[in-house]
Regions:
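A generic local secondary-structure boundary/capping motif
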Residues: 7-8, 69, 122, 143-146, ...
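General beta-strand structural signal in soluble alpha/beta enzymes
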Residues: 19, 45-46, 80-82, 107-110, ...
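Short gly/pro/ser/thr-enriched loop/turn and capping motifs at secondary-structure boundaries
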Residues: 24-26, 51, 112-115, 163-164, ...
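Class I SAM-dependent methyltransferase SAM-binding "motif I" and its flanking Rossmann-like core
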Residues: 83-150, 200, 213-217
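A contiguous loop/helix-start segment that scaffolds small-molecule binding in enzyme catalytic cores
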Residues: 148-220
């Protein structure tokens, strides 16, 4: 339902549909787009390993870009699927960097994970002169604390195995009670839990923590 009309038109007109898929599983983004695909479109699967090292992930994008390039050279229109927005921490950026100098690439904006999580939490992000920060959970504790203290609203992404560290930082600065945790936003298995009730030190890939300095946006 959150596919834009523009993206839908491009998807349905494409000769080829390319998308990332984990090396050991099914593609979430394809499952979202599947009801809107014609059924006779060619597909390019970009098998992406979830690794912290830059390589071999970059090799995968080299191969994916080469397959897309071959399809374009054959006169075919290619649509590349991406969860959320392609330029907001999206893997599409790596394909764009490889293809945009040689071909006309149209980037269609999408609904970001930040917007989706904010809406599902019924938590406005900013008003007036508020500063909003997007903070990767991969930061060290000192850097994360500094970013949190400098923001009216902070969205912590890439929670994953960094959950324990993130909780420690939020507790240290007295923000744990104002932190809103959500995983798999807008999906059927969406889950919203108070941060204090989260056990363990890891979270799913699709998870986010949003925290406001003053709790509510209208109390300023």
């Amino acid at each position: 339902e959150l596919i834009t009309l523009k993206a839908l038109k491009i998807l349905q007109a494409a000769d080829v549909v390319a998308y990332p898929a984990p090396a050991d599983g099914d593609s979430l983004v394809r499952s979202i787009a599947a009801p809107h695909m014609s059924g006779d479109q060619e597909e390019i699967i970009i098998s992406t390993p979830m690794v912290t090292e830059r390589y071999p992930a970059q090799d995968v994008y080299d191969e994916g870009a080469a397959e897309i390039s071959a399809a374009v050279e054959a006169g075919k229109n290619v649509a590349v699927l991406c969860e959320g927005d392609p330029f907001f921490y999206g893997s599409f950026m790596y394909l764009f960097a490889r293809l945009s100098e040689s071909y006309a690439v149209q980037v269609v904006p999408g609904v970001t994970s930040l917007a989706a999580c904010s809406a599902e939490l019924a938590l406005p992000l900013a008003a007036r002169n508020d500063v909003v920060s997007v903070i990767p959970g991969t930061l060290d504790e000192e850097a994360m604390e500094a970013q949190l203290m400098a923001s009216n609203t902070a969205a912590i992404i890439k929670v994953g195995r960094h959950l324990g560290k993130i909780k420690n930082v939020l507790e240290k600065i007295g923000a744990a009670e104002r932190a809103h945790y959500i995983e798999r936003a807008t999906m059927e298995n969406q889950r919203i839990v108070p941060l204090s009730e989260l056990d363990g030190v890891s979270a799913p890939y699709f998870s986010m923590i949003i925290v406001r300095r003053n709790g509510e946006i209208l109390d300023q």
